[in-house]
Amino acid sequence: MLIIPAIDLKDGKCVRLKQGRMEDDTVFSDDPVATAQHWVNEGARRLHLVDLNGAFAGTPIHKPVVEAIAKAQPELPIQIGGGIRSLETIEHYLDAGVSFVIIGTKAVQDPEFVEQACKQFAGHIIVGIDAKDGMVATDGWANVTDVKATDLAKRFADAGVSSIVYTDIARDGMMQGVNVEQTVNLAQYSGLPVIASGGVTNLDDVRLLKGKPGILGAITGRAIYEGTLSLREAQLLLDQNTL
């Protein structure tokens, strides 16, 4: 299991939002490439990038920044989400050295697109499911749908999706702890590996997720930026065989 640092990009800077509200941001760095290097130095084995402007615009805004990070970290698996609505965009990111592309809103609106992407880019597609009270949210979390997160995950079980990033919106950026039950439930219901996101605040949260069936990793943002969680300590804990 991996601890995956999040680098959320807004207006060229690294920020953290509270519950996905663009106006409620905290800027942590104005140099995303240096931030990526910092987390690599701290022992990161994968990076989670989000183009926040892209998520709201419906098209990538931070391509040059993402490319620069991928170029600087050629050996490191990188996953990118935010504004990915076309096969051309996916191809562009993969050609630039990104390992995984996360399809979010488009997966809800057009499930066939995900199936098509999985065929064309086998092994590189992650579905991002953002949910509030178990219901899927889209368009940068601005719109809560009547689609159940578990149903959406199940829909892609046989499509060739490599994993699911599951974000509990109510907990994201709020430092309230991770929703272990819903995350494990999603993994078991869909049969797909799940990366937990939203609310990973300290080592206790990491312990709660460790060893749970179907959990591939946990994304953490505000906690590692504000220092309530050490990336190095968390990964060390996960690498130990004991719970």
From Swiss-Prot:
In this protein, the active site sits at: D8 (proton acceptor), D130 (proton donor)
A single GO cellular-component term from the record reads:
cytoplasm
Give the catalysed reaction(s), semicolon-separated: 1-(5-phospho-beta-D-ribosyl)-5-[(5-phospho-beta-D-ribosylamino)methylideneamino]imidazole-4-carboxamide = 5-[(5-phospho-1-deoxy-D-ribulos-1-ylimino)methylamino]-1-(5-phospho-beta-D-ribosyl)imidazole-4-carboxamide
- Which UniProt key words apply to this protein? Amino-acid biosynthesis, Cytoplasm, Histidine biosynthesis, Isomerase
**Part of which pathway?**
Amino-acid biosynthesis; L-histidine biosynthesis; L-histidine from 5-phospho-alpha-D-ribose 1-diphosphate: step 4/9
Name the source's superkingdom.
Bacteria
How would you classify this enzyme at the top EC level?
A: isomerase
Instruction: Give compartment(s).
Output: Cytoplasm
Q: What is its EC number?
A: 5.3.1.16
The family database entries (SUPFAM superfamilies) matched by this protein are listed as: Ribulose-phoshate binding barrel
Example GO BP:
L-tryptophan biosynthetic process
Segment forming the signal sequence = none
A single GO molecular function term of this UniProt record:
1-(5-phosphoribosyl)-5-[(5-phosphoribosylamino)methylideneamino]imidazole-4-carboxamide isomerase activity
InterPro entries annotated for this entry?
Aldolase_TIM (IPR013785), His_biosynth (IPR006062), HisA_bact_arch (IPR006063), Isoase_HisA-like (IPR044524), Isoase_HisA-like_bact (IPR023016), RibuloseP-bd_barrel (IPR011060)
Q: Name one Pfam family in it.
A: His_biosynth
PANTHER family noted in UniProt = 1-(5-PHOSPHORIBOSYL)-5-[(5-PHOSPHORIBOSYLAMINO)METHYLIDENEAMINO] IMIDAZOLE-4-CARBOXAMIDE ISOMERASE
Family stated for the protein in its record: Belongs to the HisA/HisF family.
Report what the protein is called: 1-(5-phosphoribosyl)-5-[(5-phosphoribosylamino)methylideneamino] imidazole-4-carboxamide isomerase
